[in-house]
């Protein structure tokens, strides 16, 4: 049989679609399996090979589950709001809706050409009003529960995109969209109180099957620490500066304080500050720096001492200077820190630069040269002197500050509340109204969805104002509460909004009464297997876990965690070993591979490249190798024989069933394919195989190369689909070779080998072994040992 992929692949894609083979059935009596991949952003560039690898893991598992008798939900959709589409619309004058529709059609065609077994009856699009109605509904539920608030703050702002960015979207001081430098800007921002769920998000990680590095990244991002809040009096005022520290045991070593340049204490006591001009100049410089630049550890220590304000160390009553410095942020902690230069290198460098006292309170090191950051005996600390256990000294200090009324134990999180508004057009409208009498009022639920108006100009204003603010007919409205004149909120939600709950909509995509029917949620949730990239571990995954946990607390969903299992894929690098990029000219178009070698070759190759979670370079020669493998598989059709196959080949088949089955579950796809390649070699060596053996082979290969295997299945006389036939089962006793080669030791040294049957009698094995090494047996044989299936040992004297 020839591997005529251009005919075969179109044929089977149409057959699958016509027969609705991959459509999931709600409430089936079968055991359910919900497989999920991160739905794509449909860019104008179309699909790339990274998409193929990302989707192929759960694709293979989902196909295997169907063959194992599961009711499988394996859906796909499009995360289609976002800046790239809007920027292209601004550039070309084409409406984002038109661009999105074109990109969706292109992506859909590309995905179908690869033969993914998605349930196309459940496709979702986050820009569809029927979808974002429920995004707005969930937002309003959060608003009702006090999880939405508005504040003026220094934010990460991209001057190029003219949009506010969350910390997650501006890592490294660069815009995640256009990679421009981010600046700090004071703006009014809508936040979601994700910090209220920090503990629940941490606890939830104990109940899910995520890779260790995924859990670790989420734990680090949430960043829970235990310590104490301590109040420092400001001399000559009624003010108290509250700080948070994880090392309250070092309070006797505090010799100065640092507050954020934006701290309100400065303006409140400006008349007491002698060097206000220097303070203002430093503030101006800070406004030019990004948050990333301000918080870098390796940089020159800058700051200004506030002349006229002094803090008081609550433990010893000593007056200590207060500085402003750029590395302290109002958005982190309390906007003020205590400094213990003897035991913190940044504080040490700062103290040396500004001539501040350094008092050692933990014995060790040489503080004339550097800070001592290790453990040791407490000194210069009154009631703590002599303590050597850090945990005990912290507990004792917390007890003391509580008794003194100057502090208490506390917990802090590195994660900050989620900046949730964008000053752009192509996003979900925020369903809130600003009323001069009633304040901020929610749009009534029965008026959802609040739809985007049709506009011609998508550019934001130069001051970063949303394009929607220019549309009077949209902005001006009546207050839902009092009926008076009011104005709509003109910012839109970030792209992360729709992806925070999309997996629930797949369950019931056409429901107009709820985001999904509760009985269907109870049947399908949680997601059994979710695959995606490491780049979404600390953004999308944390956001979606937060939204899902909120819905769980409302009683809207049945599980506290949305994803039972998470896996990750590594990058596909260019043939040169570098990350693929258009500028480097090393991008591989997956449809070129489909056109030249077939979808089955592409599917097989991306999983054969190496460890699924690791990065691997593209290799054209290996692509061709996978094509040759599939051609050899097609050739096996002509090798089917009624003559019985050898016992050795039968063992090879049972071994392959066992190995491929376990490898798929462990995402060891490369070794599963290698096993099938080796089995092909065994078949060709034998020169024949039975029809039943060929059927087993193509069932094992089907999840990887479904088009070719369906064609072979049909050629063997079947009129049903291989994709829903029964997954092969192995017999454990048949996974052991009928004969094995074992070593023969004489006086501890291997002198030969003997081929033995797995159940062969001991005496027969020893007799043949002695015959093989007869010339090595000098003297008398004093001991003969046979360890079945392992070794023969003969001792002579």
Q: For each predicted feature, which ranges?
A:
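Long, charged, mostly alpha-helical binding arms that flank functional sites
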Residues: 3, 224-229, 363, 371-399, ...
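Long, His/Glu/Asp-enriched segments that create or flank divalent metal/ion-associated functional microenvironments
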Residues: 442-479, 484-488, 494, 743-747
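NTP-handling and nucleic-acid-processing catalytic cores
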Residues: 3-13, 49, 135-358, 363, ...
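Residue patterns forming the tRNA-binding/recognition surfaces of aminoacyl-tRNA synthetases
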Residues: 2, 11, 15-19, 91-241, ...
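Conserved oxyanion/phosphate-binding beta-strand-loop segments in alpha/beta enzyme cores
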Residues: 1-36, 66-75, 99-106, 282-323, ...
């Amino acid at each position: 049989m020839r591997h005529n992929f251009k005919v075969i692949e179109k044929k089977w894609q149409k057959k699958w679609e016509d027969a609705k083979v991959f459509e999931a059935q709600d409430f089936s009596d079968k055991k359910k399996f919900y497989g999920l991949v991160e739905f794509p952003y449909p860019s104008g560039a179309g699909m790339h090979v990274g998409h193929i690898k990302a989707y192929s893991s759960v694709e293979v598992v989902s196909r295997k589950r169907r063959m194992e008798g599961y009711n499988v939900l394996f859906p796909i959709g499009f995360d289609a709001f976002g800046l790239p589409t809007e920027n292209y619309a601004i550039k070309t004058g084409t409406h984002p809706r038109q661009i999105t529709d074109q990109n969706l059609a292109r992506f859909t065609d590309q995905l179908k050409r690869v033969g993914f077994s998605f349930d196309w009856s459940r496709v979702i699009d986050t820009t569809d009003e029927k979808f974002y109605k429920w995004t707005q509904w969930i937002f309003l539920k959060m608003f009702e529960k006090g999880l939405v608030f508005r504040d003026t703050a220094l934010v990460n702002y991209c001057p190029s995109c003219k949009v506010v960015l969350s910390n997650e979207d501006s890592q490294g001081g660069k815009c995640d969209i256009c990679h421009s430098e981010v600046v700090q800007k004071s703006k009014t921002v809508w936040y979601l109180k994700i910090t209220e769920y920090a503990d629940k998000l941490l606890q939830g990680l104990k109940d899910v099957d995520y890779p260790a590095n995924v859990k670790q990244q989420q734990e680090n991002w949430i960043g829970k620490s235990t310590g104490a809040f301590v109040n420092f009096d400001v001399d000559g005022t009624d003010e108290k500066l509250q700080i948070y520290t994880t090392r309250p045991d070092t309070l006797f070593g505090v010799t100065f304080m640092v507050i954020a340049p934006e701290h309100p204490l400065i303006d409140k006591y400006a008349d007491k500050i002698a060097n206000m001009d220097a303070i203002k100049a430093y503030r101006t410089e800070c406004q030019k720096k990004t948050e990333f630049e301000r918080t870098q550890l390796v940089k020159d220590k800058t700051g200004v001492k506030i002349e006229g304000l002094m803090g008081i160390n609550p433990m010893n009553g000593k007056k200590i200077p207060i500085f402003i410095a750029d590395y302290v942020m109002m958005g982190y902690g309390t906007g003020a820190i205590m400094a213990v230069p003897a035991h913190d290198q940044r504080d040490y460098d700062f103290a040396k630069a500004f001539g501040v006292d350094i008092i050692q309170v933990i014995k060790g090191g040489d503080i004339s040269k550097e800070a001592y950051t290790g453990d040791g005996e407490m000194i210069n600390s009154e009631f703590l002197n002599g303590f050597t256990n850090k945990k005990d000294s912290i507990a004792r200090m917390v007890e003391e500050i509580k008794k003194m009324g100057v502090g208490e134990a506390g917990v802090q999180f590195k994660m900050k509340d989620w900046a949730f508004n964008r000053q752009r057009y192509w996003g979900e409208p925020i369903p809130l109204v600003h009323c001069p009498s009633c304040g901020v009022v929610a749009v009534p639920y029965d008026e959802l969805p609040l739809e985007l108006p049709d506009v011609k100009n998508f550019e934001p204003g130069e001051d970063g104002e949303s394009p929607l603010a220019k549309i009077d007919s949209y902005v001006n409205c009546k207050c839902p509460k009092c009926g008076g004149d009011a104005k709509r909120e003109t910012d839109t939600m970030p792209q992360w909004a729709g992806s925070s709950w999309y997996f629930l909509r797949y369950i019931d995509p056409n429901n107009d009464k709820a985001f999904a029917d509760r009985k269907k949620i109870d049947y399908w949730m949680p997601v059994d297997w979710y695959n995606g990239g490491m780049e979404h571990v600390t953004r999308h995954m944390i956001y979606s876990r937060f939204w899902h946990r909120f819905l769980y607390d409302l009683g809207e969903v049945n599980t506290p965690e949305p994803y039972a299992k998470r896996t990750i894929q590594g990058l596909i690098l260019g043939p040169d070993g570098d990350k693929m990029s258009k500028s480097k000219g090393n991008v591989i178009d997956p449809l070129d591979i489909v056109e030249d070698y077939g979808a089955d070759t592409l599917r097989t190759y991306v999983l054969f490249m190496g460890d699924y979670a690791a990065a691997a370079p593209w290799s054209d020669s290996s692509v061709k190798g996978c094509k040759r493998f599939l051609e050899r598989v097609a050739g096996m059709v002509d090798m089917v024989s009624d003559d019985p196959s050898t016992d050795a080949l039968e063992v090879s088949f049972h071994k392959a069933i066992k190995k491929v089955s376990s490898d798929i579950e462990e995402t060891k796809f490369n070794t599963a394919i290698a096993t099938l390649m080796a089995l092909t070699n065994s078949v060709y060596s034998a020169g024949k195989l039975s029809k039943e053996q060929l059927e087993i082979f193509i069932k094992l290969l089907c999840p990887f190369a479904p088009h070719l295997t369906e064609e072979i299945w049909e050629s063997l006389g079947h009129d049903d689909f291989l994709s829903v036939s029964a997954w092969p089962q192995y017999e454990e006793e048949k996974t052991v070779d009928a004969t094995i080669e074992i070593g023969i030791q004489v006086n501890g040294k291997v002198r030969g080998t003997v081929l033995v049957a797995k159940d062969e009698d001991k005496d027969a094995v020893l007799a043949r072994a002695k015959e093989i090494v007869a010339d090595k047996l000098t003297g008398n044989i004093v001991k003969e040992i046979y360890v079945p299936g392992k070794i023969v040992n003969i001792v002579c004297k």
